[in-house]
From Swiss-Prot:
InterPro entries: Kelch-typ_b-propeller (IPR015915), Kelch_1 (IPR006652). It comes from the Archaea. Pfam families: Kelch_1. This is Kelch domain-containing protein PF0436. The keyword Repeat applies. Kelch repeats lie at residues 112-160, 254-301, 303-323. Keywords: Kelch repeat, Repeat. The keyword Repeat applies.
């Protein structure tokens, strides 16, 4: 599985470069374009040629997000940039030249981004440290040490006051922890995992908090975490396709699920709406291009999906406005 993940990342990079030229050959418009009546594309930045992957993505308040991306810019320069996304517009805040910040689970607290781990350069294990990053002044400091080592996958749920971490170790074992960022305290949870829940890292951008519970979109299934009973069980619904690294975004009408890729690196354009209250799943649209491994957020009116990987241009922010 580890070798497969590395090969997948390599293919995703090649697809992203190919997608950039293919998309441009169709005459895409600069800045922004209206694809359908409820999907719009806006450029991450005017000088970004290709998106090469995400670093972190956090919600600051009801209308503002902070994010980092690895991008190829004009002049063939690769940069790690930090942007503020507000009301459908991205604003360059600075640069974050820290190599381990690659698809890192993160949350926002007290004007800082808490980064949970990250890639260990030259090593398949992840960094066992929580860092606090201030995007306004560019400072980074060690915030807390995580109570576990030798892990290669991590997914995070944030309920607004406490984080829940779901960890996969190198030997394939799974564990869950709660983390109080105000007390800087971790606690190991006595949590059983349902059969088939094996790759929490593939749900990194598909783990959401919705009405008091956590939800993981995991392949063609959805796992439900109840913090009161410390249970993790499968929802009584299945997606019609099995894709990994989907995007999930919680809204006031349910959880929207976007894209993803399968074991053969075929990407999806499907958009689904899952309503946990009645366990219904409905296909509600199509992405403008195949996309996976992209973070997303909801500002109360629109859903934003940023960067990601796939055969599309990946230099856009997809803005999806739910109908109705």
């Amino acid at each position: 599985m580890k070798r497969g993940l590395f090969l997948t990342l390599f293919f995703l990079l090649i697809l992203g470069i190919a997608g950039h030229w293919a998309w441009n050959s169709f005459g895409s418009k600069p800045n922004s374009m209206q694809v359908t009546n409820n999907i719009e594309l806006i450029e991450i930045d005017h000088d970004v040629l290709i998106g090469l992957g995400n670093g972190f993505f956090v919600k600051v308040d009801n209308s503002t997000f902070m994010m980092s991306l690895k991008v190829l810019v004009k002049g063939e320069q690769v940069e790690h940039r930090v942007y503020r996304l507000k009301n459908g517009k991205s604003e360059l805040v600075g640069k974050l030249d820290v190599p381990f910040v690659v698809d890192v689970p993160a949350l926002w607290i007290d004007n800082e981004v808490l980064l949970f781990g990250g890639m260990n350069p030259g090593n398949i294990t992840l960094v066992p440290v929580v860092y606090a990053y201030n995007p306004e002044n560019g400072s980074m400091r060690e915030f807390a040490e995580m109570p576990f080592r030798d892990y290669d996958q991590l997914s995070l749920l944030w309920d607004g006051s406490k984080a829940y971490l779901f960890v996969r170790f190198l030997n394939g074992n799974l564990s869950a922890y709660s983390f109080d960022p105000y007390a800087k305290k971790f606690q190991c949870l006595d949590l059983g995992f349902p059969e088939g829940f094996v790759f929490p890292g593939t749900s990194k951008y598909a783990a959401v908090w919705y009405k008091g519970k956590g939800y993981f979109v995991h392949g063609d299934r959805i796992a439900v975490f109840d913090p009161s009973s410390k249970n993790l069980v499968w929802a009584q619904v299945r997606l019609p396709d099995k894709y990994w690294a989907r995007t999930a975004v919680a809204t006031d009408r349910g959880i929207y699920i976007f894209g993803g890729f399968d074991d053969n690196v075929n990407f999806s354009r499907n958009i689904y709406l899952f309503v946990p209250e009645n366990n219904t799943l409905t296909r509600v649209g199509t992405l403008p291009y195949p996309l996976g491994q992209a973070p997303g957020g909801w500002d109360g009116r629109r859903i934003y999906i940023v960067g990601g990987r796939g055969p599309g241009p990946n230099k856009y922010i997809v803005i999806f406005t739910p109908k109705g």
